[in-house]
Amino acid sequence: TIGKGYGYQVAKKVYDSKLSDDKIDQIDNILENLILDPTNRRLLINLFNIDDLSEMNLAPCAYETFFMVEYLEDNYGIVRPKLNVVLNQRSGDFIVAAHPGGWNEFQYYFLYRLIADLIGFELGTFIHNTYNLHLYNRHIDIVDNILEVEEVDMYHFIKAPFETKEEIRKEINNT
C-alpha cells in the first residue's frame, strides 16, 4: 500500500466545518468554501504532508490541486461561475501516469468534473503541470510501438459558445 499518502491525506479531518461543529476533510473543505466563499484563495488540496512523509511508501507525485472560480459573462449576458483547476505534479512516469490524458490527469480531471457538477459550476480551465516528466528505459519499446501506430481521431470537440440554436444543431449533426 502507499501508507499515509494520497487517500489518507485527503480523508484526514483537519478543517473546522463552517456548517457544523465537525471536523472535515480536504474535499469537504473545498465543497464548503466553493459554496460559502468561492473567491477564497485557499481552495487547495495538498497531499504533501511533511509530518507523514516517513510513513508514505511513495511521496505524492501529484501533490497539489488548486481550485479557482471566475465569473464570466456568456453570450446572453448572464454571468456564470466557472471552476478552474491547476494540478501540480512533482514527478511523473510518462507511460504509466503522467502523459497527457494519462492516469493522473484522468483521476484529477474526474475529481474536477465531480466537484463542478456537485456545486453547479461550469467547467473552466484544467491545467496539469508536471515538473519532472520522465521515461524509463524499460518503456522505450512501448513508446516505439506507440509511435508506429497511425494517428486516430478519437475525440471530436464541439466548439462553443454558439450564437444561435441553428449553429448548435448544425454542429451536432456534423458529429
Range-by-range predicted roles:
Residues 1-175:
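Terminal, non-catalytic protein-protein interaction segments that mediate quaternary/complex assembly
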